[in-house]
Amino acid sequence: MNQYDLNLILNPNISAEQVQTEKDYIENAVRNAGAEISNLDDLGNRRLAYQVGKDREGYYLMYTIKASGNPETAIASSLRLRDNVRRVLVVKDRPEWKTKKA
């Protein structure tokens, strides 16, 4: 099984109920792609490095998922159709990127 990082930026003006609805949809999309969620980091509203549409802020969600095969396109394409999703990035996680060699 490969490990992937799924990073999302949502509309910063959504309510807590809408955030929960989006999280449920994301979990279903990940499961439908044959993957499982191993970790979720809910970072909340943060300032963006550059303006996306009319927004200078975004609601950040960072998932760590495990899957066999290549679920990137299936997950990203289904999530990009959501109105509250501003950006989607699915990256294959590699352990050597997280450790610094001396």
UniProtKB/Swiss-Prot annotation:
<dbReference type="InterPro" id="IPR000529">
    <property type="entry name" value="Ribosomal_bS6"/>
</dbReference>
<keyword id="KW-0699">rRNA-binding</keyword>
<dbReference type="InterPro" id="IPR014717">
    <property type="entry name" value="Transl_elong_EF1B/ribsomal_bS6"/>
</dbReference>
<dbReference type="GO" id="GO:0070181">
    <property type="term" value="F:small ribosomal subunit rRNA binding"/>
</dbReference>
<dbReference type="InterPro" id="IPR020814">
    <property type="entry name" value="Ribosomal_S6_plastid/chlpt"/>
</dbReference>
<comment type="similarity">
    <text>Belongs to the bacterial ribosomal protein bS6 family.</text>
</comment>
<keyword id="KW-0694">RNA-binding</keyword>
<dbReference type="GO" id="GO:0006412">
    <property type="term" value="P:translation"/>
</dbReference>
<dbReference type="Pfam" id="PF01250">
    <property type="entry name" value="Ribosomal_S6"/>
</dbReference>
<dbReference type="GO" id="GO:0005737">
    <property type="term" value="C:cytoplasm"/>
</dbReference>
<protein>
    <recommendedName>
        <fullName>Small ribosomal subunit protein bS6</fullName>
    </recommendedName>
</protein>
<dbReference type="GO" id="GO:1990904">
    <property type="term" value="C:ribonucleoprotein complex"/>
</dbReference>
<dbReference type="InterPro" id="IPR035980">
    <property type="entry name" value="Ribosomal_bS6_sf"/>
</dbReference>
<dbReference type="GO" id="GO:0005840">
    <property type="term" value="C:ribosome"/>
</dbReference>
<keyword id="KW-0687">Ribonucleoprotein</keyword>
<keyword id="KW-0689">Ribosomal protein</keyword>
<comment type="function">
    <text>Binds together with bS18 to 16S ribosomal RNA.</text>
</comment>
<dbReference type="GO" id="GO:0003735">
    <property type="term" value="F:structural constituent of ribosome"/>
</dbReference>
